[in-house]
């Protein structure tokens, strides 16, 4: 599943941390898209172009269209090749394309943009870019669009992260144990239940993706890993686990609605000095002798 993240298109969110960096996985997915013949655009904001291209062979580098916003993010040099609106201008320009060739757009990084731009504006542009191939009237002329966004989750609060998460068709949360990297993949398909999967992997020196066997690779129903599970037995008003003595005491207890033979005899037997009552029935001509309700004319 990790090697087919871009098959569905849309926004793919790569959530990394200080312990488990995600740029290597981003470059591995970029290389895979380039080898598949897709147009690959890189919006480089966080590292230099030389650093990002390092490790790729010349064939891969020639297929990448790199937009450098690292050296001059505000376009102070007024270069002709720079987009006037910066990274957002580049994304908006890609919304106007009519090329049927599939396109992969890599944002390195989404955190850099989120720290400098309004969250609502960024989300609107990302939604427009990642859904342009599904717009009415454009499905026959515009190819599939995949947006890879590298997000440093620890730099942002739950609000912006939740907003980006709601836009993403696929979320990849990086983790691992004992030096082995893992990817928790949450995939949202149209008209289907979300599924999540954990895959173990490693990145080779040439940024090829090497999938490895892990303890759990089967797809499961979605459960958010960031929300702790709730124990339904925490706030009960009764004890679920009884000792042997408590169970015997419970079984010997007679509840108010349970009538034993002794209790029934005690209720029916008149006590000394207790007043007794009698029922008198005097039928008349208008009595309704209904066998199903024989007591409807009683005078007590």
From Swiss-Prot:
Gene Ontology terms describing biological process: positive regulation of cell migration; regulation of translation; tRNA modification; tRNA wobble uridine modification
Annotated localization: Nucleus; Cytoplasm
Principal location listed in the UniProt entry: nucleus
Positions of region (Disordered): 264-300
Superkingdom of the organism of origin: Eukaryota
This protein's pathway: tRNA modification; 5-methoxycarbonylmethyl-2-thiouridine-tRNA biosynthesis
Pfam families in the cross-refs: Elong_Iki1
Annotated Acidic residues bias: 284-300
CDD domains referenced in this protein's UniProt entry, alphabetically: Elp5
InterPro entries, per the entry: Elp5 (IPR019519)
Keywords, ordered alphabetically: Cytoplasm, Nucleus, Phosphoprotein, tRNA processing
Residues recorded as bearing Phosphoserine in the entry: 252
Post-translational modification comment from the UniProt entry: Tyrosine-phosphorylated.
GO cellular component, one term: cytoplasm
UniProt note on tissues of expression: Ubiquitously expressed with high levels in heart, brain, liver, skeletal muscle and testis.
Function: Component of the elongator complex which is required for multiple tRNA modifications, including mcm5U (5-methoxycarbonylmethyl uridine), mcm5s2U (5-methoxycarbonylmethyl-2-thiouridine), and ncm5U (5-carbamoylmethyl uridine). The elongator complex catalyzes formation of carboxymethyluridine in the wobble base at position 34 in tRNAs. Involved in cell migration.
Subunit structure: Component of the elongator complex which consists of ELP1, ELP2, ELP3, ELP4, ELP5 and ELP6; in the complex, is required for optimal binding of ELP3 to ELP4.
Family membership: Belongs to the ELP5 family.
UniProt protein name: Elongator complex protein 5
Originating species: Homo sapiens
């Amino acid at each position: 599943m990790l090697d087919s993240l871009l098959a569905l298109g849309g926004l793919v969110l790569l959530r990394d941390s200080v312990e488990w960096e995600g740029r290597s996985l981003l470059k591995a997915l970029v290389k895979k898209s380039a080898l598949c013949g897709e147009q690959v655009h890189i919006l480089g904001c966080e590292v230099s172009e030389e650093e990002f291209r390092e490790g790729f062979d010349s064939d891969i580098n020639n297929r990448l269209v790199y937009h450098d916003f690292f050296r001059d993010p505000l376009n102070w040099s007024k270069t002709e090749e720079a987009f006037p609106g910066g990274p957002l201008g580049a994304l908006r320009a890609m919304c106007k394309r009519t090329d049927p060739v599939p396109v992969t757009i890599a944002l390195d990084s989404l955190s850099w943009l989120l720290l400098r731009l309004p969250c609502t504006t960024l989300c609107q542009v990302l939604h427009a870019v990642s859904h342009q191939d599904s717009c009415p009237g454009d499905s026959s002329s515009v190819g599939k669009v995949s947006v890879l966004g590298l997000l440093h989750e620890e730099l942002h609060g739950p609000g912006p992260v939740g907003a980006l998460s709601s836009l993403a068709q696929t979320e990849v949360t990086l983790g691992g144990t004992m030096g082995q990297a893992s990817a928790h993949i949450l995939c949202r398909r149209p008209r289907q239940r979300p599924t999540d999967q954990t895959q173990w992997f490693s990145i080779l020196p040439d940024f090829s993706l090497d999938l490895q066997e892990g303890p759990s690779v089967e797809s499961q129903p979605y459960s958010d890993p960031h929300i702790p599970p709730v124990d339904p037995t925490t706030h009960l008003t009764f004890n679920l686990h009884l000792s042997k003595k408590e169970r015997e005491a419970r079984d010997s207890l007679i509840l108010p609605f349970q009538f034993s033979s002794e209790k029934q005899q005690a209720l029916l037997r008149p006590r000394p000095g207790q007043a007794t009552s009698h029922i008198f029935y005097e039928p008349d001509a208008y009595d309704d002798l209904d066998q199903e309700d024989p007591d409807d004319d009683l005078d007590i």
